[in-house]
Regions:
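Acidic, proline/glycine-enriched N-terminal capping motif
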Residues: 1-153
């Protein structure tokens, strides 16, 4: 089984949780992007990977070439001769995509436990045994994601 999908728009990195005296919460921008990832993934994949199935995930974050660059440098960027070394960090892009593919959970105060609000692509990101995250330049900003069963090769 293999899943491919594209999240249109500029890649976003996972932000640190915010902490007040009594509450810890995820910033709104991070939560919205995780929801966008979840909806895009669910719409492109109607099933769900098995609980114990090892997964291989490849994430390629494409950034627009800066408009301030010369034509020569733009062509180098598009030919992958010059790579993006700007924010967000590759690990934070990977984290937000991985968390977005998890099921959305919410604490039920009456039951005192977490309940699933919306399904994900897999049961938990602990199933991912191989992860590759790349940052590249392209004409339009987007994130391409490929998930498949990890064969251990």
């Amino acid at each position: 089984m293999r899943v491919n999908f594209t999240i249109e728009g500029t890649p976003v990195g996972k932000a640190r949780p915010r902490v007040t005296r009594t509450v810890t919460y995820t910033p709104a921008k991070t939560a919205r992007y995780e929801d966008l990832v979840r909806y895009t993934a669910i719409n492109s994949f109607k099933g769900m990977f098995d609980k114990d199935e090892p997964l291989d995930v490849k994430i390629v974050a494409y950034f627009e070439v800066p408009k301030s660059l010369s034509k020569k440098r733009k062509s180098l960027c598009l030919a992958n001769q010059e790579l993006p070394t700007k924010k967000p960090d590759a690990d934070n892009v990977g984290k937000i995509i991985m968390d977005g593919m998890n099921p959305k959970m919410k604490r039920d105060k009456r039951l005192h436990k977490m309940v699933e609000v919306m399904r994900g692509v897999y049961h938990d990101d602990k199933q991912v045994t191989t992860l590759l995250v790349k940052k590249r330049y392209a004409e339009r900003a987007r994130v391409d994601v490929r998930i498949k069963r990890d064969m251990g090769d």
